[in-house]
């Protein structure tokens, strides 16, 4: 195998369409813990079942990163490895991936490997993985692919809109009263990924349509000019259609796609939420 593209399941993409020649894509799963149950975030995960259990449980919930060994097994067997993880601000996945890189280079020092911290998650990671595949398909060298991906990652952004905040309340990150008010008043929390890779609240919007307006306003404020958009949603295709309509109202040829959030991204976005990546 000449190339491997590795992402943890902070990337919602389970497989790549039109995979570049002599290339393999592997999605390394995180796990979500609800009480005494552990859900492995792979293609067999029943996300709806996990979400039901999560909302019914009064116990704290947590996500856990893949082990270095899990990344190492994914890395092995290719001349060139491109890897990306969910932001180090939310998970230890980046640390595991870097440890695995060091382990790989001890075993196979001739391997070319680059491990990226997305400083983001979900839709923005999908954009990165798709771009990596396109660059490899062009026949570029490892160094050229890495340089292009560094530039690309600096040009993409993440926006989120949350309809529920049960996990934030349950895990002590948000006041119970604030969480209850958000639910009762149909408030949507709209924000972005900060340059440091943490989630940053920008707006409190009343209802889904106002949330879409806030998302679209932020996109334009950040220099959106009709680039690719990937909307990762947790069981909310309606908001995807509204965002697509907003984008196409000014950029009718823009490539806007949607995908259901992975298990760990469903855990963070919660029911009705989105984690959207776009090219600024």
Locations of the language-model features?
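Mixed-charge interfacial surface used for oligomerization/domain docking
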Residues: 10-31, 90-93, 97-102, 114, ...
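A short helix->loop->beta-strand "cap" motif at the edges of active sites that frequently abuts
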Residues: 110-111
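Active-site cofactor/cluster-binding pocket
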Residues: 66-101, 105-106
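Flexible, charged surface loops at secondary-structure boundaries
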Residues: 1, 75-78, 222-225
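Generic beta-sheet signal
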Residues: 3, 81-83, 227-229
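Alpha-helix initiation and N-capping motif
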Residues: 47-48, 68, 129, 142
């Amino acid at each position: 195998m000449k190339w491997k593209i590795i992402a943890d399941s902070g990337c919602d993409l389970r497989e790549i369409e039109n995979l570049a020649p002599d290339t393999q894509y592997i999605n390394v799963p995180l796990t979500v813990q609800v009480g005494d149950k552990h859900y492995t975030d792979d293609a067999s995960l029943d996300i709806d079942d996990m979400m039901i259990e999560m909302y019914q449980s009064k116990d704290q919930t947590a996500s856990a990163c893949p082990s270095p060994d899990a990344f190492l097994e994914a890395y092995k067997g290719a001349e060139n490895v491109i890897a990306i993880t969910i932001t180090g601000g939310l998970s230890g996945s980046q640390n595991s991936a870097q440890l695995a890189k060091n382990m790989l280079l001890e075993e196979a020092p001739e391997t070319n490997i680059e491990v990226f911290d997305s400083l983001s998650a979900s839709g923005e990671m999908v954009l990165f993985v798709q771009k990596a595949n396109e660059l490899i398909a062009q026949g570029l060298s490892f160094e050229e692919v890495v340089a292009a991906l560094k530039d690309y990652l600096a040009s993409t952004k993440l926006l989120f809109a949350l309809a529920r905040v049960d996990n934030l309340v349950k895990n002590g990150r948000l006041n119970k009263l604030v969480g209850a008010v958000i639910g009762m008043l149909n408030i949507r929390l709209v924000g972005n990924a900060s340059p440091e890779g943490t989630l940053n609240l920008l707006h409190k919007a009343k209802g889904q349509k106002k949330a879409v307006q806030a998302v679209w306003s932020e996109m334009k404020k950040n220099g959106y000019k009709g680039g690719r958009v990937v909307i990762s949603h947790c069981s909310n295709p309606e908001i995807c259609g509204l965002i697509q309509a907003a984008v196409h109202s000014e950029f009718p040829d823009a490539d806007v796609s949607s995908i259901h959030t992975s298990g760990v991204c469903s855990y963070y976005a919660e029911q009705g939420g989105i984690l959207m990546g776009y090219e600024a």
